[in-house]
Every structure is written in C-alpha cells, then in structure tokens.
C-alpha cells in the first residue's frame, strides 16, 4: 500500500483544492457529503444492498457503511463521521485504520439521528451532497446538491488523479483474472450460471461488490445488450459466448467485454475483424480528439465489416447514412469510467454544466467530451443480430442487407469487445490488454 499512500496524499490535496475553489465561487462554507443510508424493501424487514454515494467514495474507500459523513471546506483537515453502532444483530465495521485515515479527523457516530451533534452549528452556508434530501431538510440544510457544485464536481470527475488511475489499473488486473477463468469455463462446457460463479470466485467479489450486474450470454442471448438472466441449463449447441463483466478496487470500476466462438468459423473471423477495428480506434485516441468523432469513425469501420462479411451491400458511407450500421451497432462506442461504470461528466463541456448532447443520429452515445490527459474511457464496438432493430429499417435500407447471411449469424447473437483506456498526453494506456486479456 506504500504506493497508494503516496498517491493518495496528492489525491486528497486535489479534492481539497476543488472543494475550496467551488465553495469560494459559490460563497459556501463547505460540503457535507453523506455516504447514504439503508433502503428497506417494501413490506419486509430486509434492506436492499447498500450502494454508497459516489461523491462520498471519491474521498475514501468506505463502500459498505451507511450513515457516514465527510465534512470538508478545502482548508481544514476533513472530518469523517464514521457510523459504528452498538448492534448485536449485525457485524459492526471496525474503526478504519488504513493508509488514508491520517488525512481525516475521525469521529464515531453510534446513532444516525445524533449526526447533528457532529455537524457545523450553522448550516446556512454549508451544502448537503447526497441522496437523502429528507434528511437534509430535517438537519436544516438550505443548499442541497446545488447545481453549480454538482456540475463542477461532475466535470472534474473526468480528470483522474494518479491515485484514481492506480486504483483503476488494479480493478482491471482483478477483472482480467475473472475473464480468463470465464473463458476457460465456456470452453469446458459450463452454463451461464456456472460461468458467473467461476468468474466471481476468481476475482473474490460477490454479486453486490462488482460494479454492475455481469452479462454472461451464450449463443443468441448475446444479442440482448443488457442480458442478465443467467440460464442454469446448458445449451444443446454451444456456439458463442459474450461476457461483459467488471471488478472494483477501492470503489473504482473496471468494465470489460469479450466475445468468443466455440469453433473456428466465420463468426470467429468476424470477432477477429472487430477486434482489429477496436484497436484501430484506440490508436486514434489522444488529447484534443472528439469522442463523437471516434464513435462516427467506428460506424464507418463497421459498415465496411458488414460489406466484407456479406451482411450488407453498398458502401460504408451508404450504410451509415441509411442507418444500417446503427441497426447492427446500436449503442455508443463507450463512456467515461471511474467511481461509476458510466461515470458522471460525459456530456459536460465545462465546469458550469454546459451540456453537449449526443448527435441526433446516435442518441445512445454516453460521452461527447473532447479527450484530455488523465481521462479513462471504455472503447466497446459491437455488432449484433437484433431482429427488432433490423425490422425497423426503411425499405431502402432493408434492400441493402443480405438476409441469408444474417440468418446464418443470428444463432451466434452478437459481438462486443471492450477495453479500459487511459488517455495520456503522449500515448494511450490500454489497461485491459496490458494485464493480459489480449483476445
């Protein structure tokens, strides 16, 4: 942890600088950041799995403890009010002792409703940052998630500190181990459910610890973009496998996708071809490049793949203009990555919150930023046989499609290949590939 401790010192300095700057700009005394609180299931005495406020875990890697608070003004040492109740029903987390604790004045809270005792006495100029506005009301906060503050914080989420980049490297390293285990499980004949268990066992994280619900899809299920059903029964015929699965490290996410063919066939060749497209797009990433331009370039690459593999006729430009490529590749090229899988700030033009909308022809693109050093993004081109989208094409566009080849590819579902990439000033760092997930 020595390296993380060193990097964390600079990380805290940057977070304090940001808080000081936005509070001075907005005439605030500071921010009070709430980790969150449990949500009770309807008509039950059980809570939903706790998910921490991402603005809270930006400060420290406490991910599983509700009713905690960070009090920061950008000048003084931040206070961590750590919830440690007297409870014989549940495990009570120990008082933190880690590489980051020296940076906080840690105070212990035993009852959630006693938090007012730990907060500044006059909250008129302090801003509450969190989900539970009812709690903020009771405590007397006038400023609750003010737009100017949130826009500022979201915009700067794209600019990762060196501590954050190292956490994301470690998240990728963990996830790659899971992907390799899942790949072997697929070729060993496992079901979707069994592959999922193999993955989680390998990375040592549970379903509520990974950053999102894993997509483990065999055969035609790979055409369902957010498939999470996990069939227990093994398919009668094993054709293809798409896995979109991540891992967490200190609250930072990895988000990786791979697709495999059970046999060396035409679908396998299409995977190889799309992999080359993905790497070609990554090579074009550098500061100053518009992410929208990379997305549109990907559509032209995919248009050529459709022609090369006999899925469509015409030119790549025609297939893009007719919307054919959007039927085969309906989602965005990727998104910003960090504390959240779809990290905040992907549409932010500036600190003030100026919104850059996705192009009208590509409404599902999650990032419209201009690339800059220390940003982390996913690059995830895909190609799927989704009948719903193909059927919605115009008559002219349908004429460009070779339906015989589409029918042949349909049982394989689709392909997605996704890496996590750091943009540096003079290079790109493909974390996913560098940790050994090369195919």
UniProtKB/Swiss-Prot annotation:
EC number, as in UniProt: 3.4.13.9
GO BP terms: proteolysis
Highest taxon above the source species: Bacteria
Cofactor(s) required, per the database record: Mn(2+)
One Pfam family linked to the record: Peptidase_M24
GO annotation, cellular component aspect: cytosol
Keyword Lipid biosynthesis assigned: no
Catalytically driven reaction(s): Xaa-L-Pro dipeptide + H2O = an L-alpha-amino acid + L-proline
Keywords for this protein: Dipeptidase, Hydrolase, Manganese, Metal-binding, Metalloprotease, Protease
Binding locations of Mn(2+) 2: 244, 255, 418
Broadest EC class assigned to this enzyme: hydrolase
Binding positions for Mn(2+) 1 per the UniProt entry: 255, 335, 380, 418
Cofactor-binding details, from the entry: Binds 2 manganese ions per subunit.
Molecular function via GO: aminopeptidase activity; metal ion binding; metalloexopeptidase activity; phosphoric triester hydrolase activity; proline dipeptidase activity
Family note: Belongs to the peptidase M24B family. Bacterial-type prolidase subfamily.
Protein purpose: Splits dipeptides with a prolyl residue in the C-terminal position.
Protein name (database record): Xaa-Pro dipeptidase
